[in-house]
Amino acid sequence: MMSITDHDTVSAYRHLPSEIGLHLVPGVEFSSAWRDIDVHVVGLNVDPYSADMALVCDEQAERRLRRAEKIAKKLFAKKLIGSIDGALEGVRKIAKGSTIGRPHFARYLVEIGSCSDTGAAFKSYLSAGKIGDVKDEWPHMCEVVGWIKAAGGIPVLAHPAKYKVS
């Protein structure tokens, strides 16, 4: 038994062959906000063909695209990339149809020679407090939990050791 939980998309389930020899539990991972903290919530056993799930995945992808545009503008202002449109095209190619995130920008910065490796890209430009660390307004965690439940899923906190709460 296994689950594919990509950020903000269930598209992997549409591209799988009907017989892969594994029992897959359909899943998704959403970014959300709770008490000024970015919290990731996994939805297990969601209906990947639900119209509501498709809608919220599209909304999250739009949020990520707006965030990517902001990141590209900041990197361009520091002359780390040649053009905003070129960077967005480059990260889209790297993302291969999945939602765009900072790891795609890290790979792009390596690809164009602005950084030696993705670790350096994060350390210098994309990690917390750096120019490419663009905060987004994620939906509240309760809203995300509602989306998951509406699609028949079970919400699970992702990366529980990451959050410093008591």
Where in the sequence are the language-model features?
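Hydrophobic, aromatic-enriched interface-forming segments
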Residues: I81-E137
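Acidic/histidine-rich helix-loop elements
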Residues: A54-L55, D133-V134, V165
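A metal-dependent hydrolase metal-coordination microenvironment
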Residues: M1-I100
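An N-terminally biased module of ancient metal coordination in phosphate/nucleic-acid-related enzymes
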Residues: M1-I37, S124-I131, P139-S166
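A short alpha-helix capping/helix-coil boundary motif
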Residues: Y49-D52, D85, F122-Y125, G152-G153
